[in-house]
Amino acid sequence: MDSTKTNNKWAAAGILNSVGKDFVAGSVGGMSSIMAGHPFDTIKVMLQDASGNLPKFKNGFQALKYIMKVDGIKGIYRGLSVPLFSVSFTNSVFFATNNFCQSYFHPPCKDENGEDILIPYHKAAAAGAIAGGVISLLITPRDLVKSKLQVQCRPFGSTNVSLQYKGPIDVIRQTIKRDGIKGMFKGIRSTFCRDIPGDAVYFVVYEFMKRKLLALSKNNNNNNNNNDNNDNSSPKAGVPAWVAIGAGGCAGMSFWMSIYPMDVVKTRIQTQPDHLPPQYTSVLQTITKIYREEGISVFFRGFSATILRAFPTSAVNFLMYETTRNLLNSKDPFYNNNDHYNAE
């Protein structure tokens, strides 16, 4: 009985230790990816806009040209402060939730040969879906504020026209004053519809690509007879940088390819004018309305800018996450490579 209690205490301590690392690594990865991808995100939101503040753009280059003329370089970074200051928390929760669920669904174990038994893809999908649901609660208010700041713009050549919002705090203040606290969660259903399936795909693709790239790396090392100098021989080596970049970039592209139309729906709901009766009241009504009025192509408006952004931002996110986690593991005297997230 005493040994069982002791083992449970050690297991709980191990989980807390792992979650703590996820929070730190997720914070570093999230902030790095936001800095890399925000200009592309601004262009995407401008193309999806429903506020009426902007002209209709044919493509991302036209939107970029317009914002540079009107506001200069600062225009493409409008709304950056919102995700930059919040992403350290949201990305930490995202990775910590996913990894906790992976450990719950598939505790670390080895086969008869002493090799790690990797998490099945359906369990990785379930963990990613839960993480997507949790993170939706946190990012809906953030995306609402960010999107409203990104689409407000003075007409070209006009300097005397005042903007509706002075900054993130003003968006929050006006929204709560007008709609109450529930107004900050406008678009939450569409965010759930986007992130729950999207993040299931996200982590499955990451796991799949990581395993393929690690296997390729192992084969190359064996062929070159460099086993003595193989970085993977260290139990604390973790995921190599190039693997994190390749697998992370593919995961990011897969996420957007799987759910992009729902992102358009979310943006339409969140950027519609506040001073007018709402055009878009639900996910299904929004899909029906914009399809009837604008056709199927509207669901892919801004897709090119998003895909261009997806690979580098997700690659940076996973690179910094894995690098930070590897560093933390290397400083941890109790780490023994039984980490649930290590696919080696």
From Swiss-Prot:
Q: Does the keyword Membrane apply?
A: yes
Topological domain (Mitochondrial matrix) residues are: 44-75, 138-186, 260-301
> Where is the protein situated, by its record's location annotation?
Mitochondrion inner membrane
SUPFAM superfamilies xrefs: Mitochondrial carrier (SSF103506)
List the GO cellular component terms.
mitochondrial inner membrane; mitochondrion
Main location per the UniProt record: mitochondrion
Membrane topology of the entry: Multi-pass membrane protein
Entry similarity comment: Belongs to the mitochondrial carrier (TC 2.A.29) family.
Protein name in the entry: Mitochondrial substrate carrier family protein D
Q: Identify the coding gene.
A: mcfD
